[in-house]
Design a protein with these regions (language model features):
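Conserved beta-strand elements of the Class I
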Residues: 1, 30, 129-132
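A short, structure-level motif marking secondary-structure boundaries and short turns
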Residues: 2-5, 103-105
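Phosphate/Mg2+-binding loops and adjacent switch elements
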Residues: 82-135
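N-terminal phosphate/diphosphate-binding loop that engages ATP/GTP or pyrophosphate donors
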Residues: 3-94, 110
């Protein structure tokens, strides 16, 4: 799981680079972003998911909406959110047949102070190795 340590580290670029490198080496790879994190004013498909769809031969699932995740976390339903993330992840693994899934974590920001904890919880729930993305 690629986990950005802050804003502006280029986690989407790193995700795309890892996916493309694996594809070039013949690895059956896919991509998963558990929770969308749109920039102010953005609408439609989450940016990382859209970039991966456009640049690679991959059709990743839609991430959960940020507002949904925030609501689940603030109403003490993080465990349910994690169960739903795991279920979506497992469905995608089964549907894609991928050997490797590149998982992109949330960027920690002032507006999403829960991002680091959620990234850790998601990585733990998915039994994913954590790779920190820095400058």
């Amino acid at each position: 799981m690629l986990i950005p340590v802050g804003t502006g580290v280029g986690v989407t670029s790193v995700s795309l680079g890892v996916v493309r490198a694996m594809e070039r080496h013949g690895v059956n790879v896919s991509f998963f972003k558990p929770v969308a994190q749109p920039r102010p004013g953005e609408t439609g498909t989450e940016r990382s998911t859209a970039v991966i769809r456009a640049a690679a031969n991959i059709n990743p699932p839609e991430p959960f909406a940020l507002s949904y995740a925030e609501n689940m976390i603030t109403s003490s339903n993080t465990d349910i959110l994690l169960e739903e993330i795991v279920a979506r992840f497992e469905e995608h693994v089964k549907a894609s047949g991928a050997e490797v899934l590149v998982i992109e974590g949330m960027v920690p920001t002032d507006k999403q102070p829960f991002a680091n904890k959620l990234n850790y919880d998601v990585a733990k729930a998915l039994d994913a190795d954590m790779v920190f993305v820095t400058h």
